[in-house]
């Protein structure tokens, strides 16, 4: 059941990254991109109606996950991996 949750999170993240248009990627300096990546967390929340498929898959309401470059924060645990802009990060959930 956790695999379904992880796959759903990765799918949502992939759809989110594909929805953004690549504006100015050729002109963007690598240093600017790196600064943006250091300060950016992506939040993935699971919740909603009690009858949803995720609730049936034993997912607790209010679970929030972040793609982190470094280790997971306090009260977070490593739940897998996530991709953002072609890079792989840690998926930390609380």
UniProtKB/Swiss-Prot annotation:
Q: Which GO terms describe its biological process?
A: antibacterial humoral response; antimicrobial humoral immune response mediated by antimicrobial peptide; cellular response to lipopolysaccharide; defense response to fungus; defense response to Gram-negative bacterium; defense response to Gram-positive bacterium; disruption of plasma membrane integrity in another organism; innate immune response in mucosa
Taxonomic lineage from the root:
Eukaryota, Metazoa, Chordata, Craniata, Vertebrata
Identification of the protein by name: Neutrophil antibiotic peptide NP-1
Query: What SUPFAM superfamilies does the database record attribute to this sequence?
Result: Defensin-like (SSF57392)
Record SMART domains: Defensin_propep (SM01418), DEFSN (SM00048)
Residues bearing Phosphotyrosine?
Answer: 84
Disulfide bond positions: 65-93, 67-82, 72-92
Q: Which UniProt keywords apply?
A: Antibiotic, Antimicrobial, Defensin, Disulfide bond, Fungicide, Phosphoprotein, Secreted, Signal
Question: Sorted alphabetically, which Pfam families does this protein's record hold?
Answer: Defensin_1, Defensin_propep
The family this protein is said to belong to: Belongs to the alpha-defensin family.
- Function as written in the Swiss-Prot or TrEMBL entry: Active in vitro against S.aureus, fungi, Gram-positive and Gram-negative bacteria and to a lesser extent against an enveloped virus.
UniProt KW Signal keyword: yes
State the GO CC annotations: extracellular space
PROSITE patterns named in the record: DEFENSIN
Give the range the annotation lists for the signal sequence: 1-19
Its localization reads: Secreted
- Which residues comprise the propeptide? 20-62
Q: Where does the entry say this protein is expressed, by tissue?
A: Highest expression in bone marrow and to a much lesser extent in small intestine.
């Amino acid at each position: 059941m956790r695999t379904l949750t992880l796959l759903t999170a990765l799918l949502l993240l992939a759809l989110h990254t594909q929805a953004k248009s690549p504006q100015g990627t050729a002109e963007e300096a690598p240093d600017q991109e790196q600064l943006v990546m250091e300060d950016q967390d992506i939040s993935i929340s699971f919740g909603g109606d009690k009858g949803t498929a995720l609730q049936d898959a034993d997912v607790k309401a209010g679970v929030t996950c972040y793609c982190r470059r470094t280790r997971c924060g306090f009260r977070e645990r490593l739940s897998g991996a996530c991709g953002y802009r072609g890079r792989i990060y840690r998926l930390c959930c609380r």
